[in-house]
Regions:
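A short beta-loop-alpha structural element at the N-terminal edge
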Residues: 2-14
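Acetyl-CoA-dependent GNAT
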Residues: 5, 32-90, 101-102, 107, ...
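Conserved GNAT-fold acetyl-CoA-binding loop/helix
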Residues: 15-42
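Conserved catalytic-core motifs of GNAT/GCN5-like acyltransferases
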Residues: 67-70, 75, 117-120, 132, ...
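Conserved acetyl-CoA-binding loop-helix of GNAT-fold acetyltransferases
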Residues: 93-106, 129-133
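Conserved G/P- and acidic residue-centered "switch" motifs that form tight phosphate/ATP-binding loops
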Residues: 95, 124, 150
Length: 165
């Protein structure tokens, strides 16, 4: 497995993973699949802002991807980012997501970020444990702030310090 910066040629693989997550899970609180054009614009915007889009690949193609972006747009939040990581369904549990998130830490540090946030559906205990194993701590629980699959969803925020405290 190789972890590297995603290129435009990786976007069809990212798109497949992203749309599968939208259709089958509450990891993304969205209902509508995105197009390759949408993903391309998203990727170009991340790159233009200096934010990484990391990809894990092997001989079978794209295994997963990770990225981070601004947590909030106000200047006082400029040292805080929120990350996302999504892995192809047939590769979960093999450490792909862990390596993708770990690859973000030095990139955030290089941009002088102080805290990384993870927003996780509260019912996804596996993802909460995953983040805790990577050094994230629970920071808040927001009740019924999302809605998908005809039910209300709670959101858990976790945070990890990137730089010195």
């Amino acid at each position: 497995m190789e972890i590297r910066d995603a290129g435009e040629s990786d976007l069809p693989g990212l798109l497949t993973i992203y749309n599968d997550v939208i259709a089958t899970s509450t990891a993304i609180y969205s209902y509508v699949p995105v197009t390759l054009e949408d993903r391309t614009q998203w990727w170009r915007a991340r790159v233009a802002m200096g934010y990484p889009v990391m990809v894990a690949t092997d001989a079978s193609g794209v295994l997963g991807f990770s990225t981070f972006g601004d947590f909030r747009t106000w200047p006082g939040y400029r040292f805080t980012v929120e990350h996302s990581v999504h892995v192809r369904s047939d590769t979960r549990g093999r450490g792909v997501g862990k390596e993708l998130v770990k690859a973000l830490f030095p990139r955030a540090a290089a941009l002088e970020k102080h805290v990384m946030i993870a927003g996780v559906d509260a019912a996804n205990q596996a993802s909460i444990r995953f983040h805790e194993q990577l050094g994230f701590e629970r920071a808040g629980h927001l009740r019924e702030v999302g809605h998908k699959f005809d039910r209300w969803l709670d959101l858990v925020f976790l945070q990890r310090w990137i730089g010195p405290r």
